[in-house]
């Protein structure tokens, strides 16, 4: 997401830990009336969600949007499948990626941009356990370097 755009509502931090993100896309969401109100209140969970290309359209599965408190009988199903709005070229690229072995579509963050709810969708490849361990070692080494650097600046 470029600078100065949108208010981030929810992030899928686990996705960056579990997957290598190859490419990202911005997609709009088709929502029902009370869903956008719940999103603006920050009542969204992207943890187990994923996207699939079905019949030339992209759908987001398992994204939990809590029912709106004042919504009474007009409330929505929290885990319903939601359509994503993308350009035809982008959908064709995503179809090409998902046909390849091991690629999946993962929502990385949900944000409001110009009054519309948007999802940052990542084309991802799963990490193996040893890849995750390498990342943890690299981060720990970086922390040690920064800590040593701060100690030297104090002297």
From Swiss-Prot:
Coiled coil: none annotated. The keyword RNA-binding applies. It is found in: Cytoplasm. Keywords: Cytoplasm, RNA-binding. One of its GO terms (molecular function) is RNA binding. Pfam families: SmpB. This is SsrA-binding protein. The lineage of its organism: Bacteria, Bacillati, Bacillota, Bacilli, Bacillales.
């Amino acid at each position: 997401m470029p600078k100065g755009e949108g208010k981030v509502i929810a992030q899928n931090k686990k996705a960056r830990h579990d997957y290598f993100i190859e490419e990202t896309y911005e997609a709009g969401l088709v929502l029902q009336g009370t869903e956008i109100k719940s999103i603006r209140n920050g009542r969204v969970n992207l943890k187990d969600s994923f996207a699939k290309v079905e019949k030339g359209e992209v759908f987001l599965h398992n994204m939990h949007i809590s029912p709106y408190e004042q919504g009474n009988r007009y409330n929505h199903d929290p885990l319903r499948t939601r359509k994503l709005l993308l350009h035809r070229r982008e959908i064709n690229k995503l179809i090409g990626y998902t046909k390849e072995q091991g690629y999946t579509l993962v929502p990385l963050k949900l944000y409001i941009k110009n009054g519309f709810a948007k999802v940052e969708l990542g084309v991802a490849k799963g990490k193996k356990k040893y890849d995750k361990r390498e990342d943890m070692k690299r981060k720990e080494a970086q922390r040690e370097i920064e800590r040593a650097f701060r100690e030297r600046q104090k002297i």
